[in-house]
Amino acid sequence: MKYLLRVVTLTCMVMAGVGAWVSPGYGEPYELSKNDVMDTKTLKSADISLFGVKLGDSEAKALDSLVNEKIPGVKVEQEASFIFLLDQRKPTGPMAGVRIQDGKVDLIFINNRFSYKTRGIFRNVLNSESPDDVRKLLGQEDYGDENVMGAILSYDKQGFVINYLGKDVNVEFSPLR
């Protein structure tokens, strides 16, 4: 009986320790800065999160997660309806961010300045050399436009758009239509 009590107590302590160690952001299906998801077929914009903020989250949650919590190496600025994340090393422009409308997050964006913090398939997308490289990674777009200046590749069924302008690559995640 004494042995059983010790085992149960030890198990409870281990489970409590594991629960405290795993942060809430790890439960997201695809956290841009943490998960190495490579399967693009099941990827939807509703499953994407940026430092714990997902599409449809409240303004309060976005402010708490992005502004109030310190993110290493990231400078945060809030302008109008946007929360911009800038690289502290070279704060030349936003590398990622969210747009808030009607009290909810309705757009998450990342660009190639954010590639060093991105994991999984979108790191490869942000570092791609051409629109064809993006197509090899994500498959054929639903529709798009390509000219000498660059390309817009729209993956509406999955809820994101890739803007490819030479070395500048932007990914915008929005709610599915």
Question: At which residue positions do the language-model features occur?
Answer:
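Boundary at the C-terminal end of the N-terminal hydrophobic targeting segment
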Residues: 20-27
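A cross-family detector of function-defining hotspots
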Residues: 29-30, 57-104, 120, 124-177
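Bacterial N-terminal signal peptides that target proteins for export
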Residues: 1-11
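Glyoxalase I/VOC metalloenzyme domain signal
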Residues: 112-116, 174
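N-terminal export/targeting and maturation segments
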Residues: 29-62
